Structure formats: structure tokens, C-alpha cells
Amino acid sequence: MAASTQCFLHQYHALRSSPARTSSVSSPKPNQLICRAQKQDDASNAAVSRRLALTLLIGTAAIGSKVSPADAAYGEAANVFGKPKENTDFLPYNGDGFKLQVPAKWNPSKEVEYPGQVLRYEDNFDSTSNLIVAVTPTDKKSITDYGSPEEFLSKVDYLLGKQAYFGKTDSEGGFESGAVATRNLLEASSATVGGKEYYYLSVLTRTADGDEGGKHQLITATVNDGKLYICKAQAGDKRWFKGAKKFVENAATSFSIA
């Protein structure tokens, strides 16, 4: 900038030395104005350069970081920084000789319903939705020693609840005369996991006074080291179709010998 100013001053002195153009010599003020304008342009260019550099820096950072979209559902935290999501619907539970996935919003309960019960969790808002684990001694070497899955169910039918009323009655809802409870085996299967045989049973039970339209009860059973392990998870029929199915099925099918 100093060199440019010197150039204008040099031209000014040259004009003064010419006698023919003495009257046309202009005031040195325009030189000062020109210098000021050049200073303003330099400052403006510097500001633009800074803004451009900052824009390029931000753009490069955005391209370099692979940020996932914040695809949060209602009631969930947005995935703003693109971190991998974790399954927060279930929590791992490691018991004495067994393990399973427990619904995260279910609470432990001290209520004991069945022989050998060592664990019980239930829904915070509806205790009908719950799971239990029972461990009892057995002389069987494998779950298959109980017979077929259907035969095994007949030996542990106490898990489904028994009819307490045996008087004469005719209940609505398709019940037989004198019956106030019924059950239907929806599915029975077996599988080998880790060298152990497992039975899986899905049962729908109904009672004449039930306000849930029945209960879906899922049972997983196996034998290990002289012990019969049973996991039963259940939910009322209405809640089953409103989202409880996922929690009951996952809890029952995740059960295994540790």
C-alpha cells in the first residue's frame, strides 16, 4: 500500500515541474482519498477472506464426519451426533445357572406363585404382564425325558393356574357346562441350544371372570445338572396386541442355561 501511495505523489511532482500545465495541477487531497479507499478495500477483502476460510473449514468438517440423521421416534432422544443406538427395551439378567433378557420397564417383585420360584418381574402398570423363573430338582437327564412338549405341559399345568370353582355353572364365552376356565395350546416346539434340549410352549388361557380377554403365556423349559429350569412370561390378551407381545416373547425366548 505504501508503494502505491508513493507512485501517486511522484506523478504529482512531475506535473508541478511543467510550466505549461501549472494551472491544471489539482490538490493532493484526491491522493489521500485514493489511499483511504484502498485501505477500506483491503479491510473488506480481508473480511471476505476470513468468512470464506471459515465457510470452507465448516464444509470440510461436515463432509469428513459421517453424521447419521436424527431419526428419533416420539418419546426417544434424537440421535444428534450419529452415535450407534443401543437397545434400551431390555436389560440382561444373569441368575444362578441361567440368563435372560428382562424388559427394562418391568420391576422385580417378591411375590411367589410357584414351587422353586427364584425370580419374578412385572410390568409397572399392569401386574398381569410378568415373568417368572422356577428351578426345581428332577431325576430327568433331559427335557425330552418328560415326553413330548404337550406331555410336559400336562405335568406342569400348575403354571397356567387351576380352576378353583367346581360348582354347577354355565358361563358365557364358549365355556363348557360347569367350567369357568379353559386353555388352548397355540404352539409347541423344541430346539437344541448349546447342546441342551429346550421346549417352547405358547398357551392362551381364559377365565369366565377375566377382563383381559385371556392371557398369553409363553414357557421355555430345559434340564441341566439335575434341575428343571422353567421360564414363563405372560401378558393379558388386550395388552398383548398393544405392544406387550414383543416384551413377553423376547423374555421367554432369550432364556437359556448360563
From Swiss-Prot:
Please report which protein family the annotation says this sequence is part of.
Belongs to the PsbP family.
Provide this UniProt record's keywords sorted from A to Z.
Chloroplast, Membrane, Photosynthesis, Photosystem II, Plastid, Thylakoid, Transit peptide
| Source species | Solanum lycopersicum
Q: Say yes or no: keyword RNA-binding present.
A: no
Q: What induces it?
A: By light.
Grouped into one coarse class, the protein's main location is plastid
Give the encoding gene's name. Answer: PSBP
* SUPFAM superfamilies in the record: Mog1p/PsbP-like
Please state where this protein is localized. Answer: Plastid, Chloroplast thylakoid membrane
Protein's UniProt name: Oxygen-evolving enhancer protein 2, chloroplastic
**Any one cellular-component term (Gene Ontology):** chloroplast thylakoid membrane
Which terms does the UniProt entry file under GO BP? photosynthesis
**Protein purpose:** May be involved in the regulation of photosystem II.
